[in-house]
Swiss-Prot record:
It comes from Malva parviflora (Little mallow). It comes from the Eukaryota. Heterodimer of a large and a small subunit. Antimicrobial activity is not affected by salt concentration. The keyword Glycoprotein does not apply. The keyword Cytoplasm does not apply. This is Antifungal protein 1 large subunit. Possesses antifungal activity against P.infestans but not F.graminearum. One of its GO terms (biological process) is defense response to bacterium. Keywords: Antibiotic, Antimicrobial, Fungicide.
Length: 15
């Protein structure tokens, strides 16, 4: 659970 929208590859945004 990296965020509320872990479906799209936006992991760089919460990094």
């Amino acid at each position: 659970v990296a965020g509320p929208f872990r479906i799209p590859p936006l992991r760089r945004e919460f990094q």
